[in-house]
């Protein structure tokens, strides 16, 4: 947007002040740009574009960044923006969900700034499975957590608690390790 640069400066100043007060900062680094849809493909959750958004977040000193789990890659080349190298799509990443998420983690100083992925919208009967898969992908990629609001809180309490417990089980399980 026309005010993007001033918004980033304001947020960076707010984060500096929060840190002076001893507070942690968490930034939702979601993309919002109609140009990120090209030839019928939506790149709002592309690993390269979301990774760059995460990088902006850590540059302005977010302690944790929240990002959608990537579902594809190649956003920069598709929209014809940014300086890229073919190796970032061939040698440094694959289409595997863990590799795509790892690309996000690497844009946060190789995980020094924590990545939490969003749980996404509720789809009903597949929510438990989807949440566990997202948690496993995030943890195996080096991420630090998952926020699951709608999936957990738009259902009866016992089902929401079951979903949250399943997510916790992933992060507490020592057998689920970095890939």
Model-derived regions: residue spans:
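Short, small-residue-biased leader/transition segments that mark boundaries at the very start
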Residues: 2-5
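Catalytic-face loop-and-helix region of soluble metabolic enzyme cores
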Residues: 68-179
């Amino acid at each position: 947007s026309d005010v993007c640069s001033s918004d980033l400066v304001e947020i960076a100043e707010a984060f500096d002040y929060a840190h002076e007060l001893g507070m942690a900062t968490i930034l939702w680094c979601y993309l919002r740009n109609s140009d990120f849809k090209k030839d019928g493909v939506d790149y709002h959750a592309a690993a390269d574009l979301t990774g760059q958004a995460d990088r902006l977040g850590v540059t302005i000193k977010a302690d944790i960044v929240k990002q959608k789990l990537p579902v594809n890659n190649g956003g920069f080349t598709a929209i014809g923006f940014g300086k890229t190298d073919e190796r970032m799509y061939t040698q440094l990443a694959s289409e595997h969900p863990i590799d795509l998420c790892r690309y996000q983690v690497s844009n946060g100083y190789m995980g020094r700034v924590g990545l939490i992925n969003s749980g996404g919208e509720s789809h009903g009967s597949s929510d438990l499975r989807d949440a566990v898969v997202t948690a496993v992908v995030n943890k195996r990629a080096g991420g630090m957590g998952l926020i699951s609001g709608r999936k957990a809180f738009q259902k009866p309490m016992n089902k929401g608690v079951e979903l949250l417990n399943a997510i916790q089980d992933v992060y507490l399980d020592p057998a689920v390790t970095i890939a």
